[in-house]
């Protein structure tokens, strides 16, 4: 309606301004540009949010499908392991028995466990011998233990580990005189410790089974 009035006025050569009631509804160019800019911003924001929701929905769907497949695979593996755990042998007239299949992982674990136990015992015996040498021969300027006496001392300590820190019998105790020989030279701590360790390791290897002994030698 406004455009028609403007056209008629233009044709007649007269310029008639619309009333104030209509002038308030006409927007300026700045307002139009501002509105268009706001619309573009809002449109971009809505499209971005829609794309994010679309991607999130797609990822959630893919994750759900992946979890479903993973759970199915785990279930199938569990059922297969349960089915292959034993071999069922059905013989007419004989009670049904289940024979477990050999498990290499279990055998390797047991062998490793046995090896660790042997190493631990070996280390504990070596440490014990060093402690004995340091305790019993710390002040051995006058006496030195011969090989036979040292062997007896080691065996006695292993049989009675609670008496390791008991004082060594003196030379005047009769039966224990063979543990000592008199010398004017100072005892060689290194040689005493080394000999004690060699004795313990030799006894330890003799106590092991053939397989363990072969592994120790290698």
Curated annotation (Swiss-Prot):
UniProt subcellular location: Mitochondrion
GO CC entries: mitochondrial small ribosomal subunit; mitochondrion
Statement: the UniProt record of this protein carries the keyword rRNA processing: no
One BP annotation, GO: mitochondrial translation
Major place of residence: mitochondrion
Keywords for the protein's UniProt record, in alphabetical order: Mitochondrion, Ribonucleoprotein, Ribosomal protein
Superkingdom in the source lineage: Eukaryota
Family per similarity comment: Belongs to the mitochondrion-specific ribosomal protein mS26 family.
Protein's job: Component of the mitochondrial ribosome (mitoribosome), a dedicated translation machinery responsible for the synthesis of mitochondrial genome-encoded proteins, including at least some of the essential transmembrane subunits of the mitochondrial respiratory chain. The mitoribosomes are attached to the mitochondrial inner membrane and translation products are cotranslationally integrated into the membrane.
Assembly: Component of the mitochondrial small ribosomal subunit (mt-SSU). Mature yeast 74S mitochondrial ribosomes consist of a small (37S) and a large (54S) subunit. The 37S small subunit contains a 15S ribosomal RNA (15S mt-rRNA) and at least 32 different proteins. The 54S large subunit contains a 21S rRNA (21S mt-rRNA) and at least 45 different proteins.
Name of this chain's protein: Small ribosomal subunit protein mS26
């Amino acid at each position: 309606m406004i455009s028609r009035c403007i056209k008629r006025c233009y044709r007649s050569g007269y310029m008639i301004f619309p009333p104030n009631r209509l002038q308030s509804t006409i927007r300026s160019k700045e307002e139009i540009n501002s509105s268009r800019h706001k619309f573009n911003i809002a449109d971009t924001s809505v499209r971005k949010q829609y794309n994010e929701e679309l991607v999130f929905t797609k990822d959630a769907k893919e994750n759900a499908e992946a979890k479903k497949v993973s759970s199915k695979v785990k279930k199938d593996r569990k059922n297969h392991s349960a089915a292959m755990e034993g071999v069922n042998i059905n013989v007419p007239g004989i009670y049904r028995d289940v024979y477990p299949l050999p498990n290499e992982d279990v055998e390797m674990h047991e062998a490793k466990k046995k090896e660790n136990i042997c190493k631990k015992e070996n280390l504990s015996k070596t440490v014990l011998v060093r402690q004995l040498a340091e305790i019993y021969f710390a002040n051995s300027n006058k006496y030195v233990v011969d090989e036979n006496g040292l062997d007896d001392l080691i065996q006695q300590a292993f049989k009675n580990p609670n008496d390791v820190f008991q004082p060594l019998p003196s030379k005047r105790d009769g039966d224990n005189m063979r543990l000592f020989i008199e010398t004017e030279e100072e005892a060689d701590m290194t040689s005493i410790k080394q000999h004690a360790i060699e004795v313990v390791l030799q006894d330890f290897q003799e106590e092991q089974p053939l397989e363990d002994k072969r592994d120790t030698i290698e």
